[in-house]
Amino acid sequence: MSSPNTWSIGSSVYSPVFSQKMTLWILLLLSLYPGFTSQKSDDDYEDYASNKTWVLTPKVPEGDVTVILNNLLEGYDNKLRPDIGVKPTLIHTDMYVNSIGPVNAINMEYTIDIFFAQTWYDRRLKFNSTIKVLRLNSNMVGKIWIPDTFFRNSKKADAHWITTPNRMLRIWNDGRVLYTLRLTIDAECQLQLHNFPMDEHSCPLEFSSYGYPREEIVYQWKRSSVEVGDTRSWRLYQFSFVGLRNTTEVVKTTSGDYVVMSVYFDLSRRMGYFTIQTYIPCTLIVVLSWVSFWINKDAVPARTSLGITTVLTMTTLSTIARKSLPKVSYVTAMDLFVSVCFIFVFSALVEYGTLHYFVSNRKPSKDKDKKKKNPLLRMFSFKAPTIDIRPRSATIQMNNATHLQERDEEYGYECLDGKDCASFFCCFEDCRTGAWRHGRIHIRIAKMDSYARIFFPTAFCLFNLVYWVSYLYL
């Protein structure tokens, strides 16, 4: 008879303890053998992965973060900088330029929108926790020490407050602090307008500590110190963004030596607007003033009105061109061009005034007047045989009407009494006989229009050649 604690199977006898051991070994082998593991669908695998990630991420109770912050702020004095009395606090800075523009040339300033970041170490903010970094909002900013950074050349600066203050604070467990904020700054830029509108400028953005000298705070640029956004959305209008560069310098003042960080934005002016608004109209007005050289000199109202109109138009254009500039005391490139155009237009008017003056004030020959007054001179005057090469008056019969063909007027002018015109012009009596002195300029007043048709266009073309080569390539 068998014992109650044993089972008889065939010729083998098994105890309950041995049976339990065998069961455990079989379950262990089945769990290790991959063929008996169940196949999981993709959805099950994703859930498993997410669950695994959730398990590996330590769950941080809200109370733990509150305890950490309370412990950090307990006994913390935000009026004192880190490592005070030990070493200077090192501030690493970088910025992201969101946009630049517009540039106001009259006020000599430009607008820039940036994200400004500062990083430093504060040993008082170290903590031991599974949390590596505390991501905090702007409410924590006023409770810890923040660098007193200010922008030296800013005229006006605004921090963004909609919908909440655009400030961010990060505290790592090793005491590293990151503080970023978004700013819109109207910064001063001293524009040198000598080459306007072909000028290029480097507009700075300078910042430093307001109260801590170099012995207390030292600023340094990060490796990727300044980055820019999409320049196509920038409102530069008249300018093109060329590039940027950043520098570090020490400025000495009566209160100490301060580390000053600067970013220079290189801008180049676009000429399209000023070419359409100033250069082309001024050139056309100058060319229009030359039309008077082809109008008959006896058409006094036509030539006078044309000259006065072009002069007044140039005056208006010069006034409009100056409105887009500050009231600088030096001459710009545009001022030079407009002034020369005004001189050409005014000279065309003066040319006709000179021509009309000499034509309307011509006098008969003095010798002829004497002969008319004294009949004895007419009787006894002896004339040497000469050949008169002047064109004589001719009578032309046309349609039963008699017309006198006018003699060339250039032989009818005399030098004006009381005028030393012989020093500059050839008096007409002398010109006819060829008795004018050596070195005297031989100018025929009647042909001033013919001379002006060649001189004015040639001089203006030479001026444009020198002007554009000098300002664009030299």
From Swiss-Prot:
Principal place of residence: membrane
Topology relative to the membrane: Multi-pass membrane protein
GO biological process terms on file: adult behavior; cellular response to histamine; chemical synaptic transmission; chloride transmembrane transport; gamma-aminobutyric acid signaling pathway; inhibitory synapse assembly; post-embryonic development; synaptic transmission, GABAergic
GO molecular function annotations of the record: chloride channel activity; GABA-A receptor activity; GABA-gated chloride ion channel activity; transmitter-gated monoatomic ion channel activity involved in regulation of postsynaptic membrane potential
Pfam families: Neur_chan_LBD (PF02931), Neur_chan_memb (PF02932)
GO cellular component: axon; chloride channel complex; cytoplasmic vesicle membrane; dendrite; GABA-A receptor complex; GABA-ergic synapse; inhibitory synapse; plasma membrane
Tissues showing expression: Expressed in brain neurons (at protein level).
In-chain residues carrying the UniProt-annotated modification Phosphoserine: 381
Signal peptide span: 1-38
Ranges of the Extracellular topological domain: 39-274, 322-333, 473-474
Post-translational modification as stated in the protein's UniProt record: Glycosylated.
Glycosylation sites: 51, 128, 246
Cytoplasmic side: 296-301, 359-450
Cystine pairings recorded for this chain: 189-203
Keywords linked to the UniProt accession: Cell membrane, Cell projection, Chloride, Chloride channel, Cytoplasmic vesicle, Disulfide bond, Glycoprotein, Ion channel, Ion transport, Lipoprotein, Membrane, Palmitate, Phosphoprotein, Postsynaptic cell membrane, Signal, Synapse, Transmembrane, Transmembrane helix, Transport
InterPro entries found in the cross-reference section: GABAA/Glycine_rcpt (IPR006028), GABBAg2_rcpt (IPR005439), GABRG-1/4 (IPR005437), Neur_chan_lig-bd (IPR006202), Neur_chan_lig-bd_sf (IPR036734), Neur_channel (IPR006201), Neuro-gated_channel_TM_sf (IPR036719), Neuro_actylchol_rec (IPR038050)
PROSITE patterns: NEUROTR_ION_CHANNEL
Protein localization: Postsynaptic cell membrane; Cell membrane; Cell projection, Dendrite; Cytoplasmic vesicle membrane
Quaternary structure and interacting proteins, as annotated: Heteropentamer, formed by a combination of alpha (GABRA1-6), beta (GABRB1-3), gamma (GABRG1-3), delta (GABRD), epsilon (GABRE), rho (GABRR1-3), pi (GABRP) and theta (GABRQ) chains, each subunit exhibiting distinct physiological and pharmacological properties. Interacts with GABARAP. Interacts with KIF21B. Identified in a complex of 720 kDa composed of LHFPL4, NLGN2, GABRA1, GABRB2, GABRG2 and GABRB3. Interacts with LHFPL4. Interacts with SHISA7; interaction leads to the regulation of GABA(A) receptor trafficking, channel deactivation kinetics and pharmacology.
Family per similarity comment: Belongs to the ligand-gated ion channel (TC 1.A.9) family. Gamma-aminobutyric acid receptor (TC 1.A.9.5) subfamily. GABRG2 sub-subfamily.
Notes on the domains: The extracellular domain contributes to synaptic contact formation. GABAARs subunits share a common topological structure: a peptide sequence made up of a long extracellular N-terminal, four transmembrane domains, intracellular or cytoplasmic domain located between the third and the fourth transmembrane domains.
Purpose: Gamma subunit of the heteropentameric ligand-gated chloride channel gated by gamma-aminobutyric acid (GABA), a major inhibitory neurotransmitter in the brain. GABA-gated chloride channels, also named GABA(A) receptors (GABAAR), consist of five subunits arranged around a central pore and contain GABA active binding site(s) located at the alpha and beta subunit interface(s). When activated by GABA, GABAARs selectively allow the flow of chloride anions across the cell membrane down their electrochemical gradient.
Note: This subunit carries the benzodiazepine binding site.
Protein's name in the database: Gamma-aminobutyric acid receptor subunit gamma-2
Species of provenance: Mus musculus
Organism classification: Eukaryota, Metazoa, Chordata, Craniata, Vertebrata
